[in-house]
Amino acid sequence: MPKPGEYTPDTTEGITRVEDLPKPRIKRRTRNRRRRPCPRCGHNGYRLRSVHRTLHDLGDVISGRPCDVHIHYSQHRCPKCKIYFNAPMDDLALPKCHYTHRVVALAVRLVVEDGLPYRAASWHLWRDHRIFVPFGTVQNWVEAGGGI
């Protein structure tokens, strides 16, 4: 165990292969229901199929491992208005996004409040939170939010 003020190098420093990185800790969540109300008309839509989605969340600082959220959710079809819809996941992540709201908020905060460049913010997320976000993605999030 390191003493206070003692330098300890990053455990992932020098790793060049993705297979050698620490395996992520998995959190399992489910949004799989038989029926859901249709977002358009409110009629009960029946489950058509179950689908899987993986989101990357802030990692575990103590163990030094990344964290992934595996979500099993249901896709439904409304018999009344004939539309297809998914179980809502707006509280976890934006549609078609691979990262949770916590990751997006932290990345934008690093750039806007702390004034870090995009590349440094990306490195900070990996070093301190064990989540890899390409710096171009961080730039897209900041520009979409109107931060700079």
Language model features: what each stretch is:
Residues 61-148:
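Short, positively charged, Gly/Tyr-enriched micro-motifs
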Residues 1-90:
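Short, conserved DNA-binding cores of transcription-related domains
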